[in-house]
Structures are given as structure tokens and as C-alpha cells.
Amino acid sequence: MRYVDFVDLRYEPKGTDVLCTFNVEPEGVSVEEAAGGVAAESSIGTWTELTTVKPYVEKLAARVFDIERNSIKIAYPIELFEPRNMPNILSSVSGNVFGLRTLKNLRLNDIHFPSELVRSFKGPKYGVAGIRRILRVYERPLVGTIIKPKLGLKTLDHSRVAYEAWVGGCDIVKDDENLSSQRFNPFENRVVKTLESRDRAEEETGARKVYMVNITAETNEMLKRAEFVLDHGGEYVMVDILTCGFSALQTLRQQDFDLVVHAHRAGHAAFTKNAKHGISMRVIAKIARIIGVDQLHVGTIVGKMFEARGEVAENCDALKKEMSGLRRVLPVASGGLHPGLVPALIKFFRKDFVIQAGGGIHGHRDGTIAGAKAMRQAVDATLKGVPLSEYAETYRELETALKMWGQQA
């Protein structure tokens, strides 16, 4: 089969097909030829016609069924893929095709998985509803922080910062993505001491608190760390899902630990930042949800990591829209957030998300407790419909934060 034979604009996708939307930028060929090349090389074809192709093999050919300028849609028969094997799926639809000579750029913008494939994975164990049950917080966004500085603190200082964030009002404290088990803060010591701080904060505040400890490591070591967290009364683990890999994530989820899985997307921009080439965050979010994370960083519309509103909305939709009965995943907004940005965040995300602030809490000139209080005060003010500037007349922590960083409506 020639590349153009994989283009069939009359084809109507079946309910069992895997559907991919690509943006193609051809190099020296037509869009149709480039599109056919993507479909061929990601299914049964190659650069020349073959004598070994049988009629039953031709039935497995991917089909380009829609072309609109440079946006193409390809349908893949489900028989091309092994259930419960995400590497197999991605090696086809996002593998060698990115290196084709006839393509200047290629971007996988969206993917639809049929129910049969979705249900072969475990999916989220807790999701939005389960997380809210654990924390007993139902009507507001969750407030979290990342221990700062991200690296360098010794274990006791790390646990002390966590304690201050919790008593100040944070629901969640998490490790940063590059803290694992360095000499200055070994994993097991950190888990024990920080969970002790959590227990003390819960006793003093009467509120539930959780610690997201980063267990990212070689897969077997990661499983050992998850068991250690569970054995010591932890309820959450954090995984850098792209650097440890989807297979490691799936192995973790298949253990069915009674642990909420928080997914950090460190490294995503290597795939997502170039709007013409790579893989969209929406695709990554769908894959993470299917495999089984419970909450995931999705970007934010403000702060140092801000992204286009439409893109962040698509990421949230990938986590929350109906998908073969999977639980909804809780979006996490993070990156340069502070109390003055809370109204804009809540207006966009509504209530079901995590406000994850590091410097915007620990950078408060009066310390971490004051920074956490200011963030909670900003949330309370916004939900009450009171302008932050007016609320700050009563709450000095918020007043100081607004003077330091300003505010955005």
C-alpha cells in the first residue's frame, strides 16, 4: 500500500477505533501524502509497497478520515493494540512517525481511547470525590504548598516547614519534584518526621492534613517507598510520571495500594511547549487518568508557568469529562501562585482543584504560617464574594501578601 492509500475521507470511524488528531507540517510533499505517511508508519505500512502484505493485514490499516488544512484525524483499528499496554499504544501513535523525513513538524493534539482499552487499565482509585472524603473538605478548593527551598533542607527543617504550613491552613504539603532521598534529607527519615508533624498539626487544628511524599525512583524502589509510606500512616504519594515513565506508573497503580497518587508533570514541556511539534498536555492527561492517577498538574492561567486558557481548559476536560466510567481526576494549579491571584484562579477552575503555592506561601515576609493564612484568607474572601482589598482590612496576613505581590481580578 502506498501512503496515499491510507487516506480515505469516506471512512466512518467505528466505536472501537482509537482516534488521533494530529497537526502536520509537510516537508516537500502534500498534506495528503504527509497524512498518509503518518497513518501508514503508525500502523501496517512503510516507505515502499510490500510483497508480504496479506488481505487480512490490509484490514488493520489506519485510515486518515478527515483533513482540515493541517489538522488530520486518523482512525486505528483496536486490533493493532495490546490491552493494558500503554507503551505499545504510544510506540505506534507517537513513535517513529515523529522522525519522518516528509514532516517538518508533527504534533499529537488529541487521542480518544475506546471503552475496551480504557477498561483494561485500573484508572483512578480515589479521584475528586475520594480525595475530598479523605480531607473532609467539600465546598472549596484545596490549598497546598511545596516545601521551599525545593532542595537542601535537612529533615527536621523540612518537617518544621511542613508543620507551619499545615497549622497556617494548608490542607496539603508536598515534596518538590527533584527531592527523593538525598543525603541531606533521606527518604525514610523524611517520611517519619514529616508525618509526625502532620499528626501534631491535625491535633492542634482539628482538621485533616496530608503529606505528598515524592517516591519517584527506579520502579522496584518506588514500590518499596510506597509500602513504607503506607506502613507509616501516609495517605498520599507523589510520582514524577514522565521521568519515571508510564510503565512504572502503571506498575505502581496495579499494586492497588490504599494511597492517593499525585502526578507531577516534570519534563512535560519537552513534549508540549512547541505548539507545532510534540504531544499536547491534554493527551498526557488522558493517559495519566486511564493508568490511574488521582490528581495531576494541569498548568495555570496566571503565575510563572501560565498557559493559554483554552489549553488549560482542555487539560481539565481530559481529567473531568466522562470517560468510560473513570473517576474524575483533581486538577492542580501551580507555578508562581500567590494570594492575589486566587480570585482569577477560582473564577476559572471553580471549586474542584488544588491551589498549589510554594514561594507564594513561604515567601511571605512574616513566614510560612502567615503565608498559609493569607492564602486561606484569599480563598475565603473569594468564596464570600468580598474583594481581597476589603478583606485585607481585617486580616493582616492577606494585607501583607497583597502589598508584596499585588492582586489580579
Region annotations inferred by a language model:
Residues 1-53:
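Short Lys/Arg-enriched alpha/beta "domain-start" segment
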Residues 22-29, 141-159, 209-221, 267-279:
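Active-site mouth loops of central-metabolism enzymes
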Residues 42-47, 186-213, 246-267, 311-328, ...:
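Alpha-helix-loop-beta-strand connector modules within alpha/beta enzyme cores
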Residues 43-49, 53-121:
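Phosphate-/polyanion-interacting regions in eukaryotic proteins
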Residues 123-153, 199-208, 257-271:
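N-terminal small/glycine-rich loop or linker at the start of catalytic domains
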Residues 124-132, 180-201, 219-222, 241-257, ...:
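Active-site-adjacent beta->alpha loops and helix N-cap segments on the catalytic face
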Residues 224-227, 232, 236-357:
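Catalytic alpha/beta core domains of metabolic enzymes, predominantly
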Residues 367-409:
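Extended, intrinsically disordered, low-complexity segments
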